[in-house]
Regions:
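Conserved short alpha-helical segments that host acidic/polar catalytic motifs at enzyme active sites
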Residues: 1-179
Length: 181
């Protein structure tokens, strides 16, 4: 299927220029290590998260919560890809490994590890290079996040009326994503 991501950004932290427009893209030659992130969030511990990245040996290109969040997820994505590669490299060629890694990535594990230290409100979506997509909401439910699903589409948005209007569905068919999911 297709994955479409849209985001209306209003700047609360970082710049209000074209370089701050979502989605943010993290590119890599390995398809499974590519990452796109967009969302409504404000990390209150961005300095701490940024410092964690520096301690991992990374050098993020910007000091914004969006880049910090993306690189934090990217670190654990890379870690998971490497783990799967190391487990299987003796048994498969690299082309086969690429497909196996894409099908066996543990997205929940990646996001749980990456978001462990996130503090603040967030509702975000993202996609990995091989096509798997995700949504993520802060554990305290500070930022809203809703979803609708039928036989043809799965959609998530931070505003219920956006889903209701676009897909012509009644209020009761649009569900709130539980905090921490």
């Amino acid at each position: 299927g297709e994955v479409l991501m849209g985001h209306l950004r209003y700047g609360t932290f970082g710049g209000n220029d074209l370089d701050s427009v979502h989605p943010f893209v993290r590119e890599n030659n390995w398809i499974t290590r590519n990452l796109i992130v967009a969302g409504n969030f404000n990390m209150v511990n961005n300095e701490f998260l940024f410092q964690q990245l520096l301690e991992l040996g990374q050098h993020p290109k910007q000091f914004t919560d969006t880049v910090t969040v993306m690189e934090k997820i990217g670190h654990f994505l890379d870690d998971e890809v490497q783990r799967l590669f190391d487990e299987r490299k003796e048994y498969h060629d690299n082309k086969t490994l690429t497909h196996l890694i894409a099908s066996d990535l543990d997205i929940q594990r990646i996001l749980t590890r990456a978001s462990k230290d996130f503090e603040g409100g967030f509702a975000m979506c993202g996609m990995f290079g091989h096509g798997d997509a995700f949504v993520l909401r802060d554990p305290n439910g500070i930022r809203p996040l809703y979803f609708y699903q039928d036989d043809e589409v799965v959609v998530a948005a931070s505003e219920r009326p956006a889903i209701m209007t676009t897909f012509n569905v009644p209020f009761e068919k649009v569900n709130e994503l539980k905090p921490g999911h």
